Amino acid sequence: DFEIIATKNTYEFISPLLLETISRKKVYSQLFDLDMEKNIGHIRLARDNTHIVVYPATANIISKFAQGLCDDLALTCMIAANKPINIAPAMNKEMWDNSLIQNNVKLLREHGHNFIGPDDGSLACGEYGSGRLVDPIEIINQLK
């Protein structure tokens, strides 16, 4: 079983209705949702699941997480989690290789978080290199 937390940027690529339809799940996205927060929902989402997977993990969310920022529901749940986070990076090869991103990756690994990927391959920008999002089946295999 799983829960979905979508960031504001998620909805630039996929609509909330489509995400709920294909997942057949409620999609959480608002940090200050009154109904959810009556029961401290961000803590429940962070702790009531066996695994937490960030898919895809942009340079932005990796950097914010490494610095402990909690400016949306996803990051707040990641910080509140009592387990390692599984992070699947997806970005341009130059972004992935940037020393600032690599320092944040190192810091998160030192704190016990796991990185799944990125793969080498064709990137969304048309280039080839490291930074490609791993296939969903790879995430499932890593979590077994």
Regions found by a protein language model. Name each.
Residues D1-N86, K93-K144:
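A cross-family phosphate/adenosyl-ligand binding-site feature
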